[in-house]
Amino acid sequence: MLNLTPAEPVIAYRKFHFVDNSNWIYLHNNMRVYANIDMDSDNGLGFRMQSDKNDSISLQNMNVELSRFQLGELSEVLPYMPRLTGLFSAEAQYIQTPTSLQVSAEANIDELTYERQHVGDIGMGATWLPGDKGATHYLNTYFSYDNREVMTADGILTQKNGKARWK
């Protein structure tokens, strides 16, 4: 087991603290990663990486989240990057079983501005789900603007005779 130290790490000039001693990662000999990391900073930025220890069916079951990352801080330190502001948050879940893989991710930016021009609230997400016996996979995506869904795309990937085909 790997315990992350110190108790209040400084990352990118920001002081974090672990919530309720949630500061460990464990790599089992079967290559499954177990984790319980919950870090918050003084300005609300958070990072979480957690696995379900009670899940005995999946080979891997992991959630990762980054919340309230201030884009303005990034554009101030990267040369030639356009001036962006807003709060970026993202969450992803990865579940792997012996026969299938499921992935979902969502990201949003609240109050996005680009070169001091208001853009709005932007959100997007995607989900990849297994189908019948690994021969079919489903994809669902969306894009939102100011909390209204403005675009969706769904797809089905099928395999027949070793060749993949999108519907």
Positions of PLM-derived features:
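Interface amphipathic segments
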Residues: 1-167
